[in-house]
């Protein structure tokens, strides 16, 4: 990907996101996280040079590899994938800006225990399965507030920053919107 194409594509995405944001509220702040799952280091560097600063990976090993390959760039790295318990220590050592996929109280307790042992803190979002889809991880909406409170009370090494939810996988806009009510 060349810089001109990257810049044009990024500008188009920013324009669409900004338009959607303004239709909802001019007071909301939106950050675009470029998911680099299928991108090589050259493409990520090109997008960085075009203005994209935050990138997300869905596998701990891929996050580590890309962070190492691109360490000269001050990229804001996010973890967006399902976190397996056997990968927690590796993720903690990478210290991503934000973990988007804290999908259960059990995972939060295990993550907190390992953070405490390393004397570290980590920012995270509670993942809510608002579409009630079996293929998606996350807590169900009706227990989300209670689990959020439990994590706040019992996991001092996790800095909860909010929730993350993915709408229904559908072409039906009404069904997608229902996922976020």
Regions found by a protein language model. Give the residues of each.
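Conserved alpha/beta-domain cores
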Residues: 1-181
């Amino acid at each position: 990907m060349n810089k001109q194409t990257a810049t044009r594509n990024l500008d188009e995405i920013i324009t669409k996101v900004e338009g959607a944001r303004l239709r909802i509220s001019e007071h909301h702040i939106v950050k675009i996280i470029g998911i680099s799952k299928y991108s090589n280091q050259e493409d990520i560097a090109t997008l960085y040079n075009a203005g994209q600063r935050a990138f997300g990976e869905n596998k701990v090993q891929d996050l580590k590899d890309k962070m190492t390959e691109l360490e000269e760039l001050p990229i804001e790295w996010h973890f967006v994938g399902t976190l397996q318990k056997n990968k927690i220590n590796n993720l903690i050592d990478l210290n991503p800006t934000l973990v988007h996929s804290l999908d259960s109280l059990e995972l939060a307790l295990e993550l907190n225990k390992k953070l405490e042992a390393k004397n570290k803190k980590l920012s995270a979002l509670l993942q809510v399965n608002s579409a009630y889809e079996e293929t998606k991880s996350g807590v169900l909406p009706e227990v989300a507030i209670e689990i959020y409170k439990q994590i706040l009370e019992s996991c001092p090494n996790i800095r909860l920053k909010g929730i993350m939810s993915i709408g229904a996988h559908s072409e039906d806009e009404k069904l997608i919107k229902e996922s976020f009510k």
